[in-house]
């Protein structure tokens, strides 16, 4: 039989990777691509904390945030600055900014302390690096996570070297391994292109990140792993129909495809079955009936409660508290 033509270059998925299950506790840090995969994991019923500092783009901001979590830092007003009617933290995404320092500090410290409490039970730390370019504040010498629209003259912008990233993360991985010997690291490079300096500079930036991660894998072969999200978008989905309107961010379809490839790499057949069961329950609850007081809908809700109880009985790590409360709220007394 004649071979069929192949119009796609397939990326070989890494073999022999440790599995990810619903019993695992996961922390995701990094760029908006970490948000994309994190939302998929959340919808699939996994236990996770997603970007407790908000979206972070460069590797040094991620490592600084992790060190502050390790130390359970308590932020105070001196860590903030006021600009354009809002109080900001240079270490945090703009989603933490607020009109008063008290509001900003409450948002920051509550997320940081929650992440600190979860550290001892973490199984996976998933880090997505977006760019090797950093902004260093001239006055303080601090690499910031977000400029918060301050004038560019306040900052020195430069590209990190492979050696800088490797040295920083070697110390961090060693420190965190001493605190949690079971912790595994999964690195990805965001497929989102940063084109401020042009495509060539973007390639140099991404290459720096890839080389640094490869070196960390060599140094920590039992702890550090890599998922080729960057390569999958650039090779398997080499078409602008897989991008959003800005032609830079992956489209929802591309994110779903990456999720499928992620699932192939890390999920057992049993885990995939649990995901289907979780999503079925949530899909049922999303159904809006015309007659919520009807006997038929009340029976339908009762069946959902039974499904939840059976699934939790088999997989006690699943969290269906919100779904159970919603069912009981809708059930007639």
Range-by-range predicted roles:
Residues 132, 174-203, 236, 278-285, ...:
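Active-site segments of SGNH/GDSL-like serine hydrolases
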Residues 30, 126-130, 188:
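Short beta-strand segments
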């Amino acid at each position: 039989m004649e071979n069929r033509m192949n119009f796609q270059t397939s990326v070989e998925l890494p073999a022999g990777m440790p599995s990810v299950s619903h019993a695992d506790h996961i922390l995701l840090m990094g760029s908006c691509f970490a948000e994309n995969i994190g939302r998929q994991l959340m919808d699939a019923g996994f236990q996770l904390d997603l970007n407790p500092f908000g979206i972070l783009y460069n590797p040094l901001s991620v490592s600084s945030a992790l060190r502050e979590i390790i130390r359970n830092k308590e932020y105070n007003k001196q860590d903030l600055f006021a600009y354009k009617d809002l109080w900001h933290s240079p270490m945090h995404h703009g989603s933490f900014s607020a009109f008063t320092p008290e509001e900003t500090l409450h948002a920051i410290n509550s997320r940081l302390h929650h992440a600190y409490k979860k550290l001892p039970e973490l199984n996976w730390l998933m880090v997505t690096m977006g760019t090797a370019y950093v902004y260093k504040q001239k006055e303080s010498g601090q690499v910031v996570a977000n400029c918060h629209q301050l004038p560019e003259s306040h900052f020195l912008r430069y590209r990190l070297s492979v050696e800088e990233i490797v040295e920083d993360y070697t110390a961090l991985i060693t420190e965190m391994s001493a605190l949690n010997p079971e912790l595994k690291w999964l690195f990805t490079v965001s497929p989102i292109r940063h084109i401020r300096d042009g495509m060539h500079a973007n390639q140099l930036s991404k290459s720096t990140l890839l080389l640094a991660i490869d070196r960390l894998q060599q140094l920590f072969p039992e702890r550090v792993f890599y998922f080729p999200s960057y390569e999958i978008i650039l090779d398997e989905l080499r078409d602008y129909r897989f991008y959003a309107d800005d032609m830079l961010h992956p489209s929802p379809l591309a994110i779903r495809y990456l999720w499928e490839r992620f699932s192939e790499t890390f999920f057992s057949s049993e885990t995939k079955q649990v995901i289907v069961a979780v999503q079925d329950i949530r899909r049922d609850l999303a159904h809006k009936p015309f007659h919520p007081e009807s006997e038929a809908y009340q029976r339908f809700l009762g069946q959902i409660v039974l499904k939840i109880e059976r699934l939790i009985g088999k997989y006690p790590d699943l969290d269906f508290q919100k779904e159970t409360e919603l069912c009981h709220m809708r059930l007639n007394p």
